[in-house]
Amino acid sequence: MLSAIISTQNSERSLVPTLSALVPAAAAGLLAEVVVTDGGSRDATAEVADIAGCRFTSSAEALGIRLKAATATVRSPWVLFLRAGAVLQPGWIDAAEHFMQTAELSDGAGRAGVFRLPSPTHVVRPGLAEVVAVLRALIARGPRPEQGLLITRRLYDAIGGHSAGDDAEAAILRRLGRQRL
């Protein structure tokens, strides 16, 4: 079982496809809850989260503080961090289940996973953001916050969770390093 935490800021439109991609996981019994942690939106982000049955929190605190606070409230042993607008590719549920089972059979506390970035060919009309994200991933050769992060609560707590800054998503990926991803 896993809990999803989605970071938002004026994300009423981009939140919808992210939540839609999670529906099959909820129907399959894999996804227990979704927490939307917001940075003070002035649009209908809260209403979208409410209609979808998500728990919604809003704060002017830095992103890392919001993510850490949201993580403290979830019930599942696995946490999936996503940004609003992230749409996991088809097959992500099977990949996540396989990864979680494999990690639990080996050293479950020592591994985390990221998802593949969608290639521009998988996007109906790729925009500049999708193309730049793919190019950045190819050049950097490292995981990006746009990919999402699947991590056990034990490992999350062991590394101290998200740092307090606004660059918290990239910082936690750097702290995890390639050996744990």
Model regions and ranges:
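Acidic donor-binding/catalytic loop of UDP-sugar-dependent glycosyltransferases
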Residues: A44, G64, L82-F99
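Conserved donor NDP-sugar-binding/catalytic core segment of glycosyltransferases
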Residues: G91-V124
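A recurrent flexible, glycine/aromatic-enriched loop bordering the glycosyltransferase active site
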Residues: R111-V123, A133-I151, D157-A158
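Cell-envelope/extracellular polymer assembly enzymes that use nucleotide-activated donors
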Residues: M1-S3, E33
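Glycine-rich, basic loop-to-helix element that forms the pyrophosphate-binding segment
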Residues: S59-V74
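Short aromatic/hydrophobic "clamp" motif used to bind/position activated sugar donors
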Residues: V79
